[in-house]
């Protein structure tokens, strides 16, 4: 199934390549976005986090980055010595991260989920943990993390009914993805039920609420901090 998935991903990439080239010519900053998305991250862009046991937190766009902000603040407060990497997919998400997450040691565009790209980026960064926000689970990236025994914790997890139907088509891959995640921190009991029905281990599922509404960046309890520290090693 991975072969079929990768053939589809590579085919889709070449189909949209002319559009990417056009945007690179016409849109300021898009060349950097594509360079990083294809794994061409410069050493100086990740020197503060690469091979230093960083915490890698990923949010696709503006909404996910807003949800990421209070989490980053609490991690920085609890573990100031650990570098933090934040990644985003969209230009809006990237710009928002630079505006509201000054605590991050590095901010990059997320690598495309092509096997050679994911493998290269994970090998260069080697985070201590990867924390995708909401439903940002990508097969090749998770596979590269799993092969290096790097834990994955989903935060602010959200699964829609439409997503449930879509993920069921990823048989042979979806089970691997779920088994790679060591903890599912879901927004609601409904989201928890969805991820459970999709095959996640119930003992790994927690309902933690939606961090997007955590506007005051409330203090976490000592028990929460101890659990985070244990999970992060």
Kindly give the residue locations of the regions a language model identified.
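Short, intrinsically disordered, charge-balanced linker/junction segments flanking boundaries
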Residues: 229-233
């Amino acid at each position: 199934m991975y072969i079929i998935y990768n053939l589809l991903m590579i085919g889709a990439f070449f189909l949209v390549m002319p559009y990417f080239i056009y945007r690179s010519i016409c849109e300021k900053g898009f060349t950097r976005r594509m360079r990083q998305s294809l794994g061409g991250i410069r050493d100086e862009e990740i020197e503060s986090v690469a091979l230093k046991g960083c915490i890698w937190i990923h949010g696709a766009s503006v909404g996910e980055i807003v949800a990421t902000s209070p989490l980053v603040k609490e991690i920085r407060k609890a573990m100031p010595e650990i570098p933090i990497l934040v990644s985003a997919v969209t230009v809006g998400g990237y710009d928002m991260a630079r505006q509201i997450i000054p605590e991050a040691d590095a901010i990059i565009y997320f690598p495309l989920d092509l096997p050679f790209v994911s493998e290269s980026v994970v090998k260069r960064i080697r985070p201590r943990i990867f924390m995708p926000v909401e439903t940002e689970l990508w097969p090749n990236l998770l596979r590269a993390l799993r092969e290096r025994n790097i834990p994955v914790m989903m935060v602010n997890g959200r699964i829609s009914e439409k997503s449930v139907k879509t993920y069921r088509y990823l048989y042979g891959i979806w089970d691997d993805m779920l088994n790679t995640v060591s903890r599912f921190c879901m927004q609601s009991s409904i989201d928890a039920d969805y991820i459970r029905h999709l095959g996640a281990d119930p003992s790994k599922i927690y309902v933690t609420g939606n961090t997007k509404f955590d506007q005051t960046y409330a203090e976490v309890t000592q028990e929460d901090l101890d659990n985070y520290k244990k999970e992060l090693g």
